[in-house]
UniProtKB/Swiss-Prot annotation:
It comes from Anaeromyxobacter dehalogenans (strain 2CP-C). It comes from the Bacteria. Keywords: Ribonucleoprotein, Ribosomal protein. This is Large ribosomal subunit protein bL19. InterPro entries: Ribosomal_bL19 (IPR001857), Ribosomal_bL19_sf (IPR038657), Translation_prot_SH3-like_sf (IPR008991). Belongs to the bacterial ribosomal protein bL19 family. GO terms for biological process: translation. The keyword Secreted does not apply. The lineage of its organism: Bacteria, Pseudomonadati, Myxococcota, Myxococcia, Myxococcales. GO terms for cellular component: cytosolic large ribosomal subunit. GO terms for molecular function: structural constituent of ribosome. This protein is located at the 30S-50S ribosomal subunit interface and may play a role in the structure and function of the aminoacyl-tRNA binding site. The gene is rplS.
Amino acid sequence: MLRKAIADIEAKYLRTDLPEMRAGDSVRVHTKIKEGDKERIQVFEGVVIAYRKGAPGSSMFTVRKVSYGVGVERMFPVHSPRIDKIEVVGHGGVRRSRLYFLRNLQGKAARLHQEEGPGAADAAHAAPTPA
């Protein structure tokens, strides 16, 4: 009975606008940052290297990017109110659920093969076409 009451309370705070994503996807996470009395949106773009699904309120995903030659990883709670939106930019073709091996790779070796899909098509149109 107590578990049902807790589940009912948690259900109000769960996000319903989540895109379909998995490890290997390139994502753009828009987070709300509070600086003093102002609030702004900061974008963190990278590859999902882990997606931990657990109880509805405890799901998390880890995004990795390389910034100025330094690898940066950030963990996000899926249902966090600090996340404004999550955009899937492309789908990477991987056969693993945890891509921790990317930490040891550099340059072209760290790239993932991009699969064709709705997110990948949008990214392809954004790139300039060679003349």
